[in-house]
Curated annotation (Swiss-Prot):
This is Cyclic pyranopterin monophosphate synthase. It catalyses: (8S)-3',8-cyclo-7,8-dihydroguanosine 5'-triphosphate = cyclic pyranopterin phosphate + diphosphate. It comes from Streptomyces griseus subsp. griseus (strain JCM 4626 / CBS 651.72 / NBRC 13350 / KCC S-0626 / ISP 5235). Homohexamer; trimer of dimers. The gene is moaC. Substrate binds at residues 89-91, 125-126.
Amino acid sequence: MTGAPSARRSELSTQNRLTHIDETGAARMVDVSQKDVTTRLARASGRVLVSPRVIELLRGEGVPKGDALATARIAGIMGAKRTPDLIPLCHPLAVSGVEVELGVADDAVEITATVKTTDRTGVEMEALTAVSVAALTVIDMVKAVDKSAVITDVRVEAKSGGKSGDYRRTAPEGPDA
């Protein structure tokens, strides 16, 4: 029992610091070799604000460059798989599944990515990368029609598995929500 308060302090200090920075402030890749292999899932979302003309084209004849949503879906899947090549301290993982969904709203293309693995660390970065690459691809596909498209609201919506437990983003409350 004498070690319990010390262990709790250590756990709290670990939760309240950046794990990718060592004591001297240098970047490092976290050692996950002692973590349990568990099934982990993450879902992220984002939006690409586009002009009414782009919405009209996406709902109708399509944009001049081709099938924007199908291209963005494949790009998002590829992005999830390439995350450790793009994010320097991200661990290479055995990604076991990626789903990227795109929908056309009244003012935006809405993107959701779900990534799954059975590994030692989570797939939040893979889900965020999938959304981001899909969003960039939407912009590439519509730029001939709308040069002012904007990527917004890229965020983790939920995660499960692992030591830190489950997370689900809650909607903000209040009149401006």
